[in-house]
């Protein structure tokens, strides 16, 4: 039976990288009897605003709700500005509507050959390996707010509930327990200032103690963690959890460690991937890069996002791992886009990965 994948290319480079993800998945389907896909394309973001006036058309949301998984390219661009209707509203809405409460962003080196591209010294960057787990549907991004209506006052509010924090803590614990020995959990907050952070810290501590006593959790203030991330990133190896906005910031900081935003994938899940069939939305960590010429964007992050989809949502661990291996082989061979010091185009990198994964699975 084919897996139904809704593809939301989005804006600018999102169109190109979505094509490359489909290319490698179709290559896998040629050699793996289990891997059969039905791709449905829909609009989101600025392209959706241009066509329909809405950043997330009803038909796109309805299709996503019926799909086995969603692949998303990238959303946004200066064309749509910061007006009342913005591309990013489509992202926030689909996350909320699909109850995608946990965003997973691995931070590691897809290949050791990329160490020299890190802005950090190799001796500091080598061995960096953690997963940032972001609470995705609560906090200040979804709290009450007031716009400046001419009185010169605007505000946003952060609200978290105990069940919301428990849920994201259980996701972190599940991921930690997939390793032997289990990985440590780092919980980042601002408990010395914010009431919401004090609830966060208390709830994380209680949940781990009562439900996962075999795990260790370490609490770190977010500003201190940001410093550690640059000074000694391997100190944070393991699973990192924090609130929506803090994770948005810290994960972008972490994303530059491997040398390019074009390398890091992400998964947004609606449940624990304990059966390898959790519903999820998969997208690269980078944005839509509107200034990048055609054929220059690195498709690796999008392709690795597809690998995460295979493993976490489609119960195709063998195929997902083969795709990750193919990416490593291609990068090691020197086939790279310009952000990695190479001269290959987007499609050439995709072609090479598609060829490599077929050879691995054949």
From Swiss-Prot:
Binds 1 Mg(2+) or Mn(2+) ion per subunit. The keyword Ribonucleoprotein does not apply. Substrate binds at residues 95, 105, 134, 223. The record marks 141, 190 as: Important for catalysis. It catalyses: (2R,3S)-3-isopropylmalate + NAD(+) = 4-methyl-2-oxopentanoate + CO2 + NADH. GO terms for molecular function: 3-isopropylmalate dehydrogenase activity; magnesium ion binding; NAD binding. It is an enzyme of class 1 (oxidoreductase). The keyword Aminoacyl-tRNA synthetase does not apply. It is found in: Cytoplasm. SUPFAM superfamilies: Isocitrate/Isopropylmalate dehydrogenase-like (SSF53659). PROSITE patterns: IDH_IMDH. One of its GO terms (biological process) is L-leucine biosynthetic process. Pathway: Amino-acid biosynthesis; L-leucine biosynthesis; L-leucine from 3-methyl-2-oxobutanoate: step 3/4. Keywords: Amino-acid biosynthesis, Branched-chain amino acid biosynthesis, Cytoplasm, Leucine biosynthesis, Magnesium, Manganese, Metal-binding, NAD, Oxidoreductase. PANTHER family: 3-ISOPROPYLMALATE DEHYDROGENASE. Homodimer. Catalyzes the oxidation of 3-carboxy-2-hydroxy-4-methylpentanoate (3-isopropylmalate) to 3-carboxy-4-methyl-2-oxopentanoate. The product decarboxylates to 4-methyl-2 oxopentanoate. Belongs to the isocitrate and isopropylmalate dehydrogenases family. This is 3-isopropylmalate dehydrogenase. The gene is LEU2.
């Amino acid at each position: 039976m084919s897996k139904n994948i809704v593809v939301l290319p989005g804006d600018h480079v999102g169109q190109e990288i979505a094509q490359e993800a489909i290319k490698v998945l179709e290559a896998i389907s040629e050699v793996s009897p289990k891997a059969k896909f039905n791709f449905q394309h829909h609009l989101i973001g600025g392209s959706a605003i241009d066509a329909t006036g809405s950043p997330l058309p009803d038909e796109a949301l309805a299709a996503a709700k019926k799909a086995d998984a969603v692949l998303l390219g990238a959303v946004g661009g200066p064309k749509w500005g910061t007006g009342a209707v913005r591309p990013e509203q489509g992202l926030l809405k689909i996350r909320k509507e699909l109850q995608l409460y946990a965003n997973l962003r691995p931070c590691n080196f897809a290949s050791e050959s990329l160490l020299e591209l890190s802005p950090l010294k190799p001796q500091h960057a080598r061995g960096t390996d953690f997963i940032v787990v972001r609470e995705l549907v609560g906090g200040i991004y979804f709290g009450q707010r007031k716009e400046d209506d001419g009185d010169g006052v605007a505000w946003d509010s952060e609200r978290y509930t105990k069940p919301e924090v428990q849920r994201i803590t259980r996701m972190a614990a599940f991921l930690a327990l997939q390793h032997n020995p289990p990985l440590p959990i780092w919980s980042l907050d601002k408990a010395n200032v914010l009431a919401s952070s004090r609830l966060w810290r208390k709830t994380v501590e209680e949940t781990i103690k009562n439900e996962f006593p075999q795990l260790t959790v370490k609490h770190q203030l977010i500003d201190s963690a940001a410093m550690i991330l640059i000074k000694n990133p391997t100190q944070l190896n393991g699973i990192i959890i924090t609130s929506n906005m803090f994770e948005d910031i810290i994960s972008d900081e972490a994303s530059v460690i491997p040398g390019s935003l074009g390398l890091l994938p992400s998964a947004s899940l609606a449940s624990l991937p304990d059966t390898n069939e959790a519903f999820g939305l998969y997208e690269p960590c980078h944005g839509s890069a509107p200034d990048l010429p055609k054929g220059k964007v690195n498709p690796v992050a999008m392709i690795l996002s597809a690998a995460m989809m295979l493993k976490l949502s489609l119960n195709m661990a063998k195929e997902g791992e083969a795709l990750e291996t193919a990416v490593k082989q291609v990068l090691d061979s020197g086939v790279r886009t310009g952000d990695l010091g190479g001269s290959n185009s987007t499609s050439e990198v995709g072609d090479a990965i598609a060829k490599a994964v077929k050879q691995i699975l054949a």
